[in-house]
Regions:
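Conserved helicase motor core of SF1/SF2 NTP-dependent helicases
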Residues: 1-6, 12-122, 126-223
Length: 223
C-alpha cells in the first residue's frame, strides 16, 4: 500500500472475513485484494483463489456469442487475469487453473455453491443487482475470506436496476467481521493524471447533480 487509505484497506482485509473496497479506477482496490489473495494462498491460509465479476456487458446474450464457453466469458474476465499475472509467474497460471487452485469465473457461476477454504474476490461489484450481491455473499463457506471491489460511479446496469454495491453498506454496516473501506482520487496510483481526471469528473458530477434535472432552464423547450 502506498497511501494511508490503502493501508487501512489492507489491514481491514487481514482483520475481517468480508471486506468491501469502494473507490474510483486506479486506487489499487483490486490489485491489493489480489496481492492479499496470493499471499493467503502461499502461506496456506486458504487452498484456492476464486476471482469473479459480473459479465454485465454480455447480458443474457452470451449464449449467442460464437465459440466455447471459455472463449465467450474470457473477455469479461480479462482484467482479473491481468491482475493475477502481476502477482504470479504467468506461465504457472494455466497449471493453477487446471488444478483448481485458481478459478476465474463469471458471477452467475457462483449460484448454488458453498465456497470453503478460499480467498474470493468479486470485482466490478457495482454491476451486481442487490439480489446478485446477496447471492454472492451467502456463498461464504468455512475458512474463507471475501473481498468485494467496485466503483459506484461506473454502474453499467440497465436503467431502473439498482446497484447492489450502492445499497449493501446500508444493509450490512455495523455487522461484526464486515468492513467497508472507501478510497478516493487521492489514492490513485496509476499515472499522476488519472487522479486529476477522477477528481475533475467528481466535481463535474457534483455540479450536474446540483443543476441537472431540477434546473428549469435545462428543461425549457427550445422554440
Amino acid at each position: 500500500p502506498k497511501t494511508l487509505d490503502q493501508k487501512r484497506y489492507v489491514d481491514a482485509i487481514d482483520a475481517h472475513t468480508v471486506t468491501f473496497g469502494i473507490g474510483p479506477a486506479g486506487t489499487g482496490k483490486t490489485y491489493l485484494a489480489m496481492a492479499k489473495a496470493v499471499q493467503a494462498l502461499q502461506t496456506k491460509q486458504v487452498s484456492r483463489i476464486i476471482l469473479t465479476r459480473p459479465a454485465v456487458e454480455a447480458g443474457e446474450k452470451i449464449g449467442f456469442l460464437p465459440g466455447t464457453l471459455s472463449e465467450k466469458i474470457d473477455p469479461y474476465l480479462r482484467p482479473l487475469y491481468d491482475a493475477l499475472r502481476d502477482m504470479v509467474d504467468p506461465d504457472s497460471i494455466p497449471r493453477l487453473i487446471g488444478a483448481g487452485t485458481v478459478e476465474v469465473a463469471p458471477l452467475a457461476y457462483m449460484r448454488g455453491r458453498t465456497l470453503n477454504d478460499a480467498f474470493v474476490i468479486l470485482d466490478e461489484a457495482q454491476n451486481t443487482s442487490p439480489q446478485q450481491m446477496k447471492m454472492f455473499l451467502t456463498r461464504l463457506g468455512s475458512g474463507s475470506k471475501i473481498v468485494v471491489t467496485g466503483d459506484i460511479t461506473q454502474v453499467d446496469l440497465p436503467g431502473g436496476v439498482k446497484s447492489g454495491l450502492r445499497v449493501v453498506q446500508g444493509i450490512l454496516d455495523g455487522i461484526d467481521d464486515i468492513a467497508f473501506c472507501n478510497l478516493t482520487s487521492h489514492d490513485v496510483v496509476r499515472h499522476r493524471l488519472v487522479g486529476k481526471i477522477v477528481a475533475a469528473y467528481d466535481r463535474y458530477d457534483t455540479v450536474a447533480e446540483s443543476y441537472g434535472p431540477r434546473n428549469p432552464r435545462k428543461n425549457r423547450k427550445t422554440r
